[in-house]
Amino acid sequence: MSETVSAKKFGKVAVMLGGTSAERPVSLNSGNAVLAALTRQGIDAHAFDPATRSLGDLMSGEFDRVFIALHGRYGEDGCMQGALELLGIPYTGSGVMASAVGMDKWRTKLLWRAAGLPTADWAMLDATSDFAATEARLGLPIFVKPAREGSSIGMSKVTEAGTLQAAYEKAAEHDALVLAEKFIDGAEFTVGIVGDSALPLIRLQPAAEKAFYDFEAKYLRDDTQYHCPAGLPDAQEMSLRKLALDAFRLLGGRGWGRVDLMTDRLGNPYLLEVNTSPGMTDHSLVPMAARVAGIDFDALCVTILEQTLG
């Protein structure tokens, strides 16, 4: 903990976890890990699950600030951030606008493309789409994903002609907005952001039989490989870190977050998506990169919370 910041200065902290989104189980793991870390540091932290408690309890319970460990809808998409703004309670992470835009992969890509930042070509799908024409335009393989879900929920990799519609229907079970994205053949990276700095890159390498870095690879398997340092030349590492920071700031991101990207076989980068409330589980990526940067998990949680002191 910062020498100038004592545990008492944080007052009473609500660690918001769980919620009602499809990512509730991951959020419970994240929140409980954060709660344990803050408690170890002597901070008066308490679990707060908005699925079972009223937000009015934040006021009646005299909470001074909130550590948001929610993932997905109603926790990561600006809704909770807006409620906390109205209540006048400081909270961790991005504000209303950046949270809402960051949760929407389509609008995120629109902003990046308009600003000249590199992102893979895409098409939006609905039940009336010409799926054959989309396959022809983007080429196979194609990634299909709900535009407003995280943790790779509802995501598919289309590798055979004529199967795009089935992938769309799977994604549409989770969101009315469905994104079809051109496959980038290369390496996948993630960049954690804390404050004004980008953490060391992590290169993701799912097990050989996995088609992509899906929910199972993220949270359930132990054979997914994470390379940090990523093994890139220093100049390329710093260039990708800067790109991630630029992409995060363009959306109005603040506090902390994570940006996912890929490089093709020639080393050209392509932004994939931004996460304004990343996971904090034992499989999570921001804590992993922070450790490489010399920041242990407890210190990371306190650093994120310190940003609510203003």
From Swiss-Prot:
Function: Cell wall formation.
Any one GO CC term of the record: cytosol
Keyword Secreted: no
Co-factor binding details: Binds 2 magnesium or manganese ions per subunit.
Enzyme Commission number(s) of this protein: 6.3.2.4
Annotated Mg(2+) 2 binding sites: 273, 275
Places the protein is found: Cytoplasm
Leader peptide range in chain numbering: none
InterPro entries with a match to the protein in the record: ATP-grasp, ATP_grasp_subdomain_1, D-Ala_lig_Van_CS, D_ala_D_ala, Dala_Dala_lig_C, Dala_Dala_lig_N, PreATP-grasp_dom_sf
Cofactors demanded by this protein: Mg(2+); Mn(2+)
GO BP: cell wall organization; peptidoglycan biosynthetic process; regulation of cell shape
Domain ATP-grasp: 109-306
Homology family: Belongs to the D-alanine--D-alanine ligase family.
Descriptive protein name: D-alanine--D-alanine ligase
Keyword Cytoplasm recorded: yes
UniProt-listed Gene3D superfamilies: 3.40.50.20, ATP-grasp fold, A domain, ATP-grasp fold, B domain
GO MF, any single term: metal ion binding
